[in-house]
Each structure stands twice: as structure tokens, then as C-alpha cells.
Amino acid sequence: MAEKVNNFPPLPKFIPLKPCFYQDFEADIPPQHLSLTKRLYYLWMLNSVTLAVNLVGCLAWLIGGGGATNFGLAFLWLILFTPCSYVCWFRPIYKAFKTDSSFSFMAFFFTFMAQLVISIIQAVGIPGWGVCGWIATISFFGTNIGSAVVMLIPTVMFTVVAVFSFIALSMVHKFYRGSGGSFSKAQEEWTTGAWKNPHVQQAAQNAAMGAAQGAMNQPQTQYSTTPNYTYSNEM
């Protein structure tokens, strides 16, 4: 079996760094979980883009007469939250759907709830916190309308991220509870060390993929058991 080579993030060749993770949705994720996993990945991308747009909004805030603190913090949030959100909540849910790991699901719930709280705070927009939220944007309309209009763009995006994050958390929680997952199951994985055993993870992945393949082939198997009748042409 060929060794999997890390391919994410896809860095340009002139950067003297190598990708840190291997990511292949079609190869790793069972078909029944593929759509939800990709949606969570797109949510991470939207959050990263929003942080970049927020940096532009804070630059307009600075040019319009705001303090430099917000711009500095916006830059810090961009370089900090983009990789941390990928490592802390997307990789756990990717691994959870890949290996059906309750421990990974619990890690996702813990970190993603923190992500949801952060998204709400960003949408609110407390002045001096480096985010163009509603409070900061609305209050700046009286100072510089042009800058406030630019600030309104990341404000709306932060709001969308917060709403989508709540929906995503609800969807994953509903799936996890419906599949029989529980906190005690995650504790059992932690105690036995199954969450970090590559052989157990591979077996779980193969079982999940096999179950998905069996579900897809079930109608074909059902029809294959129908008796075949042959008739002789001789009279």
C-alpha cells in the first residue's frame, strides 16, 4: 500500500515549507458523510476569508480615524485563527467521520462551541477587539461613512459565519446522537487508547466504508437472488 504524502495546505514550491496534513475527501470519508464534511470545510474557508476581509475593514477603520490597535489585532486574528481553527476543530471532525471516533467527535464539539462563541463575539463587534462587528460599525457611521461602509462587509460576513456555525453544530450533534454516540463512549476510547491506535482507526475506517458500500449494493443483491428460468427451444 503506497504511503500517503501530505498535501495540505498546498504551498507554492518557492516556499521552503512542506504540507502538514493529508486530505482527500473521496478516499478518506465514507460517501454518506462526504457532503457534511465538505460543508464544514467550506465553513472553515469562509471563516478564513472573513478574517482576511476583516483586516481590510480594520484598515479602512484606521484610515477613517480609528485606532491602530484594531488593525494590529485583526492581523493577529488572521494569522492565529486560520491555522488554529483548521487544526482544532476541522481536523477532529474530519478524523471523526473518517474513523467513526467518538473521541474525535467530542474534541470537535468542545472546540467548535468555542468557535461559535468567538464568531458571535466577532459579529457583535466590541470596539478595540480588532473586529468590525455591528457595534463598532454602526458607531463609526457618525465619524466616517465611507470607512463604515467598508466595515459593514466583514460585519455581515461575521454574522453569516456565526449563523452557519450554529447550523453546522446542530447538524453534527443530531447525527452523532442519532448514531448512538455518547460521552461515555468517548471516555472508553480515551481509556483504551483506541483513539490513537492506527490499526483500530484503519479497521473502523474499513468497516465504515464497507457498510456504505454494502448499502449501495443492497438493491443489486436483492435482485440477483431472483430465480432464473430457462426455456428450451426444442419442442
Curated annotation (Swiss-Prot):
- Annotated membrane-spanning segments are 40-60, 68-88, 103-125, 149-169
| Molecular function GO labels | protein-containing complex binding
| Sequence ranges on the Extracellular membrane side | 61-67, 126-148
How is it placed in the membrane, per its record?
Answer: Multi-pass membrane protein
Q: Which GO terms describe its biological process?
A: exocytosis; negative regulation of endocytosis; positive regulation of calcium ion-dependent exocytosis; positive regulation of cytokine production; protein transport; regulation of synaptic vesicle endocytosis; response to endoplasmic reticulum stress
Superkingdom, taxonomy of origin: Eukaryota
| Signal peptide range | none
Q: Where in the cell is it found?
A: Cell membrane; Golgi apparatus membrane; Golgi apparatus, trans-Golgi network membrane; Recycling endosome membrane
Q: Which Pfam families match?
A: SCAMP (PF04144)
The record's keywords, sorted A to Z, are: Cell membrane, Cytoplasmic vesicle, Endosome, Exocytosis, Golgi apparatus, Membrane, Protein transport, Synapse, Transmembrane, Transmembrane helix, Transport
Q: Name one GO cellular component term.
A: synaptic vesicle membrane
Query: Which intervals lie on the Cytoplasmic side per UniProt?
Result: 1-39, 89-102, 170-235
What function is annotated for this protein? Required for the calcium-dependent exocytosis of signal sequence-containing cytokines such as CCL5. Probably acts in cooperation with the SNARE machinery.
Complex and partners: Interacts (via C-terminal part) with SYT1 and SYT2; interaction with synaptotagmins making a link with the SNARE molecules. Interacts with SLC9A7.
Family (UniProt): Belongs to the SCAMP family. SCAMP5 subfamily.
Name assigned to this protein: Secretory carrier-associated membrane protein 5
Which species is this record about? Rattus norvegicus
